[in-house]
Amino acid sequence: MRAVIIDYGVGNLFSIYSGLRRVGFEVEISKEPKGSEDLIVFPGVGSFSAVSKYLVARKEKFEVLRSNGTGFLGICLGMQIMFEEGTEGGLNKGLGWLKGRVDKINHPRVKIPHIGWDKVNVIKYNELSEGIDDQYVYYAHSYVAYPTDKSVILSTTSYGIDYPAVVNIGNIVGTQFHPEKSSLVGRKFLTNVYRWLRK
């Protein structure tokens, strides 16, 4: 199984590269999709405004691959970009694959950004949910997704508000947490992604 991590030109991709290799993927880092990969990964580095411009400019290529059944994994910001729009750095368009908006965590009594370990609450079970319910994973973010279609939410996390931890529709999966920084639970989730692609 081949995975390509899309390099937006910001941040360190070594952790997600290593995490994917550990669960069995052949991994490459590239600025463009190759067309023969089983999984395209949008990593969780950068800002919505900068990354959305990079990815939306290549949306047509990604759309062709998505319609052909290539899997997509978005991590943190990489998941947020899959929604219609986000407010970080001004109002910017996302890829629009998931309906809804990305906005700041809106709660007066929690510290922003949300950095550290928090619990995943699975609300919809499929192969991607196996072994992660009630487990702690690592977060580092100030913005969250507010989906208009709640059926895409597989699991949530509570931090002042309940927000999506994992979303999935068709061949698209996104996580607000960083599986590559979430120790054994993160590895289990990436293993789930590997098996999900093979089914």
From Swiss-Prot:
All residue ranges annotated as the Glutamine amidotransferase type-1 domain in the record: 2-199
Keyword terms: Amino-acid biosynthesis, Cytoplasm, Glutamine amidotransferase, Histidine biosynthesis, Hydrolase, Lyase
Primary localization: cytoplasm
InterPro entries associated with the record: Class_I_gatase-like, GATASE, Imidazole-glycPsynth_HisH
Keyword Cytoplasm listed: yes
CDD domains: GATase1_IGP_Synthase (cd01748)
Active site: 76, 178, 180
Reaction catalysis annotation: 5-[(5-phospho-1-deoxy-D-ribulos-1-ylimino)methylamino]-1-(5-phospho-beta-D-ribosyl)imidazole-4-carboxamide + L-glutamine = D-erythro-1-(imidazol-4-yl)glycerol 3-phosphate + 5-amino-1-(5-phospho-beta-D-ribosyl)imidazole-4-carboxamide + L-glutamate + H(+); L-glutamine + H2O = L-glutamate + NH4(+)
EC number: 4.3.2.10, 3.5.1.2
GO BP annotation list: L-histidine biosynthetic process
GO molecular-function terms, A-Z: glutaminase activity; imidazoleglycerol-phosphate synthase activity; lyase activity
Pathway stated in the Swiss-Prot or TrEMBL entry: Amino-acid biosynthesis; L-histidine biosynthesis; L-histidine from 5-phospho-alpha-D-ribose 1-diphosphate: step 5/9
NCBIfam families: IMP_synth_hisH
Subunit record text: Heterodimer of HisH and HisF.
Function: IGPS catalyzes the conversion of PRFAR and glutamine to IGP, AICAR and glutamate. The HisH subunit catalyzes the hydrolysis of glutamine to glutamate and ammonia as part of the synthesis of IGP and AICAR. The resulting ammonia molecule is channeled to the active site of HisF.
Name of the protein described by the UniProt record: Imidazole glycerol phosphate synthase subunit HisH
Species for this entry: Sulfolobus acidocaldarius (strain ATCC 33909 / DSM 639 / JCM 8929 / NBRC 15157 / NCIMB 11770)
Name of the encoding gene: hisH
